[in-house]
């Protein structure tokens, strides 16, 4: 089966389902009407369920993924706050939801049918948590809290309970505003994009995954950029050679090369993209990048140069209104 791309458009309450061809072309498979403004999405590690966060009736809609990638609704569960970012643990047993405006993170069990259930825990008084990211050991949840300039760390128990990690947090530069994260495939390095100054922090992971330390910070914007920074998303290629971020003010993608050990990044350049790129993603083969324009109502596909990481525009496609999230299903054997 070919890869399948899901694009969430909250303003029209739709998910567009596309098949991704081997040369980067997209073929529309399905348009799903969602019961609410669909925002964050995540795919179960077993690749058979898609989860989407909706508002104004805060909740998670679970979808079954058919063999061709199309979706069928399987259930809905409530959330304590408006979902800003969602993710699962690596075994697909629990779903985490970060709520920026409600200052909380919740954890919900996923049943044996792949359907998200009512939350079993809620962590409150987190200053504007913008994402919830499980680490490569499946034991630590990292939560960038934008308004306190810290990334909080929590231990995840086998029963799905979160408690503060021994290293409770990592402090970033004042006013940076940590937002989204990505992990290097070697599992020894993590990256966090900072919304308010459009920089990237590189984290060294040590002590068997137990300790995090910032070892590099790099500006992602052009040297002559003088407007307000407004970074959004971050992703790394599967081979760990190139890292990308999006900035919504400039409507561009920042391109970084990554050292072999992942510990050092270098700014390669920029590529203009769709207006206000809230979300983008990279296919599982590392060949294509797909960016969504929250203000353009389009997505655009780019080919990734395997040596330089630079992008070549292939084609843009109309989607729903206000697209802001892109998830990509891995090809099934």
Curated annotation (Swiss-Prot):
Hydrolase is among the record's keywords: yes
GO molecular function, one term: 6-phosphogluconolactonase activity
Organism superkingdom: Bacteria
Keywords on record: Carbohydrate metabolism, Glucose metabolism, Hydrolase
Record-listed E.C. numbers: 3.1.1.31
Catalytic activity: 6-phospho-D-glucono-1,5-lactone + H2O = 6-phospho-D-gluconate + H(+)
Pathway(s) this gene product operates in, as recorded in its UniProt entry: Carbohydrate degradation; pentose phosphate pathway; D-ribulose 5-phosphate from D-glucose 6-phosphate (oxidative stage): step 2/3
Membrane-spanning residues: none
Record carries keyword Cell division: no
SUPFAM superfamilies: Nitrous oxide reductase, N-terminal domain
A GO term from the CC aspect: cytosol
Alphabetical GO biological process terms: glucose metabolic process; pentose-phosphate shunt, oxidative branch
InterPro entries: 6-phosphogluconolactonase_YbhE, Cycloisomerase_2, Lactonase_7-beta_prop, N2O_reductase_N, WD40/YVTN_repeat-like_dom_sf
Function according to Swiss-Prot or TrEMBL: Catalyzes the hydrolysis of 6-phosphogluconolactone to 6-phosphogluconate.
Family: Belongs to the cycloisomerase 2 family.
Name of the protein in question: 6-phosphogluconolactonase
């Amino acid at each position: 089966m070919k890869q399948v791309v899901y694009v969430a458009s909250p303003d029209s309450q739709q998910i567009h389902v596309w098949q991704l061809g081997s040369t980067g072309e997209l073929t529309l498979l399905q348009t799903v009407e969602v019961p609410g403004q669909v925002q964050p999405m995540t795919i179960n590690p077993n690749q058979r369920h898609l989860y989407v966060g909706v508002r104004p009736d805060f909740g998670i809609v679970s979808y079954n993924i058919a063999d061709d990638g199309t979706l069928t609704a399987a259930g809905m569960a409530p959330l304590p706050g408006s979902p800003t970012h969602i993710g699962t643990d690596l075994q697909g047993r629990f779903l985490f939801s970060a709520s920026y405006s409600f200052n909380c993170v919740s954890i919900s069990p996923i049943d044996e049918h792949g359907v998200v259930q009512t939350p079993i825990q809620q962590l409150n008084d987190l200053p504007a948590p913008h994402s919830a990211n499980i680490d490569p050991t499946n034991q630590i949840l990292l939560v960038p809290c934008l308004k306190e300039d810290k990334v909080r760390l929590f231990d995840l128990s086998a029963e799905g309970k979160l408690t503060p990690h021994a290293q409770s947090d990592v402090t970033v530069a004042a006013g940076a505003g940590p937002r989204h994260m990505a992990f290097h495939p070697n599992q020894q390095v993590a990256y966090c994009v900072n919304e308010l100054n459009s920089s990237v922090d590189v984290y060294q992971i040590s002590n068997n995954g137990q300790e995090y330390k910032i070892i590099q910070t790099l500006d992602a914007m052009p040297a002559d950029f003088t407007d307000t920074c407004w970074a959004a998303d971050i992703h790394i290629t599967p081979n760990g050679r190139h890292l990308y971020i999006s900035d919504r003010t400039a409507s561009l993608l920042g391109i970084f090369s990554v050292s072999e050990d992942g510990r050092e990044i270098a700014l390669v350049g920029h590529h203009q993209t769709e207006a206000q790129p809230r979300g983008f993603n990279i296919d599982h083969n590392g060949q294509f990048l797909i960016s969504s324009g929250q203000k353009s109502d389009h997505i655009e596909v780019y080919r990734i140069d395997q040596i330089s990481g630079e992008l070549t525009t292939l084609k843009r496609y109309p989607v729903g209104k206000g697209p802001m999230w892109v998830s990509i299903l891995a090809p099934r054997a």
